[in-house]
Amino acid sequence: MKLPILYTFRRCPYAIRARMALYYSGINVIVREISLKNRPEDLYAISKKGTVPVLLLPNGTVIEESLEIMMWAINQSDKDNWMFFDKNIQLNIISINDTHFKKHLDDYKYNSIPSNKDELFGLCAKYLDTYEKSLDKYL
C-alpha cells in the first residue's frame, strides 16, 4: 500500500499540528523533513508556494494547508471524538489563534525593544487565558 507523503519542517507550528493530527488519527505517512534554506524541487512540483506542511495523498491529491490536513486526518479517524462539539466554534478558535494570537506571539518573540516586552506578553496571555477557560470544563 502506498503511503501519503508529508513535507514538513520540525519547528514550524503549522507542520507540528498537521503531524499531531496525522499521528492522532493513526495515519502512517512518509515524512520528508525539509530545510527551509534548500527546499526540494519535488515539493515545488506539487505545491507552487513551497511552504510546509504539504500532504501528497496516494491518489495524487495535494493538501497544502495545515488546517485542511488536520481536518482530513480527523475525518479519517476521530477515535477520541475531538470533533464532538460545534465545528464552527472550533474553527473560529483556530482562526483567532492563527491570526490575532500568532501576530502578538511573533511580536513578542521577535521584538527587539525590551521596554514593551511585558505589554506584548500581556497581549498573548489574554488569549491563553481565554483558551484555558474554554478548556476547563473538559479537563
Task: Indicate where each model-derived feature is located.
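GST-like domain detector, emphasizing the conserved glutathione-binding G-site
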Residues: 1-129, 134-139
